[in-house]
Amino acid sequence: NAKGTTDQKVADLYVSGMDTVTIEKLGYGPIKPLLAQINAVKNYQELINLAADEYKEGNGFLFGFGVGPDDKISTKNVVNLSQTGLGLPNRDYYFNTDAATQKIRKEYLKYITKLFTLTGTDQTTADKQANAILDLETAIAKSHSTPTELRDPIKNYNKFAVADFQKQIPDIDLKNVFDRMLVKTDTLLVGQPTYYQALNSLLKTR
């Protein structure tokens, strides 16, 4: 493939993913700079800034951000915010008590713990941090709409002026977030406002 072409870039990406020898040799080295950034966060405002900055790198957390056609005016694109923040598929995985779901939660906890140990964290600390993450995700899940509720197009269409929605989440500076994302808008669709209201509170208390 000619250098610089789309075909060449796709081929390089595929080969890099198949090069397991190099992957094992590098370990978690490629993400060390990002982990250092995360470890340097001192307060929730710095966390918000990091989340906004990382969207430009394709790493999304805290904000379920996107741009797409307005459901009621399909000729216009609009900024969308939706619920996010869970490692499991939806809120049911955090609250259902059947045996299968309980097993999934148990294995998920093991998975999180393993990720910590792979980055050099000792087992005791890894266990503690993994439990803290699952606890936080469970708190976030409480604010999420159910899969059934997500299928309701009316319930999930909530258009706001940015200034008006800002009043509902006073500790999340939307102008700062959008400026850091290089986004300019005065209107947005918020699929699940309760998530962002809960996030506004959780950021200050967790």
Language model region names:
Residues 3-206:
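Noncatalytic, helix-rich "gating/capping" subdomain that lines the substrate-entry/channel surface
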